[in-house]
Amino acid sequence: VNTSVPSLARRLDSVRSSAIRDLLALTARDDVISLAGGLPDTDLIPVQRIRRAAEDVLAQSSSVQYGETSGWRALRAVLAQRESRLLQRTIAATEVVITHGSQQALTLVAQALLDPGAIVVVDEPAYTGALQVFSIADADIRPIPITADGMDTDELARRLGAGLRPTLVHTVSNFHNPRGVTMSTSRRRHLAALAEQYGFWILEDDPYGEIWFDTPPPPPIASYSDRVVRLSSASKILAPALRVGWLVAPEPVCKAVELLKQGADLCGSTLTQQMATQMLADSVWLDAHLNTVRAEYGNRARALCHEFVDAFGDRAQLSSADGGMFVWMTFGDGTDTTALLPRALDHGVAFVPGRAFADNALHASSARLCFASSPTPALAEAVRRLRAAHALER
């Protein structure tokens, strides 16, 4: 019997496994406090409300049938209303497509808009899931540095003036993954104006926009241009296992995505989409739930930053923690975080090294820390362990 493995498609040659997904397998030990994953806290997932929604939906036998490729109509209507309020312009339900998490939306948009070799501009450092998608699409990925107020649109403008012609610009506009920063209003306006001037699409990835601590973020980039595809998700505000994400885009893009989705999965889960509809439409409950999540994550973010300053002083810098799930840490003494990670794991703490998000030595001394998944006492212990590991590494 011939047991040799058949050759795989060449498109996989340039695709790397997500360092974060690989790291999660290493950190699944009970003795490790993980600051590595981007997981919401299980204790803050509204399990009882999800159970009630499931019971209500399952009372109708039709809830377990196939559905429309573009998603459950009532959910699209609810999301269109929410987006209309955010963007301060009318969004129709036909401009919304429901996907199997926002990662599928990212994949389908890349398939719809990118030919092989198309230029895609990304943040540096960048969301690793986006880098994977664009690599699979055989895109020519061009990083633009991210600053304290988002993508450096001045640098982007300079490169555009020098002849760069991207098809797509991807950015995480609110509480960036991994940098933790939020794009300023002026940067948003500038990026939108550049898209209009040079004719590229903006992919505004926004899974964290609802998780603000003190003040909401500025209006979305899509408020200033219709050359924007917005992505978001119920994973961070309701539950990852629902696998409900969505995109908001002009109808021609939505129709192209729907066509591709037909071939990908026919349709999503009508069961979980109906459950999500019920919860997202219940504005009184949802506002109270989001306020609980914001308050708890805000407390954790402040606690992590406080413990970090106490432990490391001016030997390390942290990004601001105004929302989302992450802070970006940089050692001032040149510590290589990739080399530090094995020692940190020996001490029972995990993080994601900066080089996982950018192939650039500038980020070798940085790391992404997630404060959302662990209660405050565990965060304090995680910093203590990290300090001990760092002391031995020096």
Feature locations, PLM:
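N-terminal small-domain helix-loop-helix segment of the aminotransferase-like
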Residues: 11-101, 108, 282-284, 288, ...
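Conserved core of the PLP fold type I
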Residues: 59-198, 209-229, 297, 377, ...
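Glycine-centered flexible beta-alpha turn that most often forms the glycine-rich phosphate-binding loop
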Residues: 205
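Conserved core segment of the aminotransferase class I/II
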Residues: 229-294
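Short hydrophobic/aromatic beta-strand micro-patches
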Residues: 248, 328-330, 370-372
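Conserved glycine-rich beta-strand-loop-beta hairpin in the small C-terminal domain of fold type I
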Residues: 294-305, 317-330
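Short, conserved charged micro-motifs
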Residues: 335-340, 377-381
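PLP-dependent enzyme catalytic core of the Aspartate aminotransferase-like
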Residues: 346, 360-394
